[in-house]
Amino acid sequence: MIGLNHYLIVSGLLFCIGLAGMLKRKNILLLFFSTEIMLNAINIGFVAISRYTHNLDGQMFALFIIAIAASEVAIGLGLVILWFKKYKSLDIDSLNAMKG
């Protein structure tokens, strides 16, 4: 039987993979993907704890995080498209070229 520990281990591993992607990558699009992996890892943890404690609070938090992640993707990808059209690059290092 799959217990709570298994779900939390998978959640922790996914979070570490997302964190490593955030720290290692210099591409804005890959940073968004890493953020989504981290948010989904948190969702797995919330839903697993919610399931084993018979409390719906974790599932409500997961739905809230999904809604926030959807808005982040919509706004973030729009900004990434505009950034690519203007600078022809998605590297984080090109952010230093911003003036404002």
UniProtKB/Swiss-Prot annotation:
GO terms for cellular component: NADH dehydrogenase complex; plasma membrane. GO terms for biological process: ATP synthesis coupled electron transport. It is found in: Cell inner membrane. Its EC number is 7.1.1.-. GO terms for molecular function: NADH:ubiquinone reductase (non-electrogenic) activity; quinone binding. The keyword Cell membrane applies. It catalyses: a quinone + NADH + 5 H(+)(in) = a quinol + NAD(+) + 4 H(+)(out). It is a multi-pass membrane protein. The keyword NADP does not apply. Keywords: Cell inner membrane, Cell membrane, Membrane, NAD, Quinone, Translocase, Transmembrane, Transmembrane helix, Transport, Ubiquinone. The chain crosses the membrane at residues 1-21, 28-48, 64-84. It comes from the Bacteria. Belongs to the complex I subunit 4L family. NDH-1 is composed of 14 different subunits. Subunits NuoA, H, J, K, L, M, N constitute the membrane sector of the complex. NDH-1 shuttles electrons from NADH, via FMN and iron-sulfur (Fe-S) centers, to quinones in the respiratory chain. The immediate electron acceptor for the enzyme in this species is believed to be ubiquinone. Couples the redox reaction to proton translocation (for every two electrons transferred, four hydrogen ions are translocated across the cytoplasmic membrane), and thus conserves the redox energy in a proton gradient. This is NADH-quinone oxidoreductase subunit K. The lineage of its organism: Bacteria, Pseudomonadati, Campylobacterota, Epsilonproteobacteria, Campylobacterales.
